[in-house]
From Swiss-Prot:
Organism of provenance: Porphyra purpurea
Family of this protein: Belongs to the ycf20 family.
InterPro entries, A to Z: Uncharacterised_Ycf20
Name recorded for this polypeptide: Uncharacterized protein ycf20
Domain of life: Eukaryota
Gene Ontology CC terms: chloroplast
Chief location bin: plastid
Keyword line: Chloroplast, Plastid
Cellular compartment(s): Plastid, Chloroplast
Gene label: ycf20
Length: 108
């Protein structure tokens, strides 16, 4: 086969696309696992301190402080962070979402 500029371009494009797609799928999978892990952690965070009754305010203040600290790290600068910071942010989002779902379950 003759190597023309068009065939070289397409072969480079396909290789570049497949490597980016592979990296994106790995990052997406890790992000979803982190999100679901945060949802699972929030279930534990809402049930364990609720059993004793006296840890509710302390646990809530620690959770809010941790969420605000992660938000400050992630959203303070405009530069792109690595995968670990994104996973930490997904974990935070999962915890927040799980706590809202538990609050709606208790309210209904």
């Amino acid at each position: 086969m003759i190597r023309t500029k068009l065939s070289i371009f397409f072969s480079y494009f396909v290789q570049n696309l497949s490597s980016r797609l592979y990296y994106s799928l790995n990052e997406l999978t890790a992000g979803l696992i982190s999100l679901l892990l945060g949802f699972f952690i929030s279930t534990g965070l809402s049930t364990i301190p609720g059993q004793t009754g006296d840890w509710g305010i302390i646990a809530a203040s620690l959770i809010v402080a941790a969420i605000e600290l992660v938000s400050k790290i992630v959203y303070s600068n405009k530069k792109k962070y690595g995968v670990r910071i994104n996973l930490l942010n997904n974990l935070k989002i999962g915890i927040t979402y799980g706590l809202f779902v538990d609050a709606f379950k208790l309210g209904s």
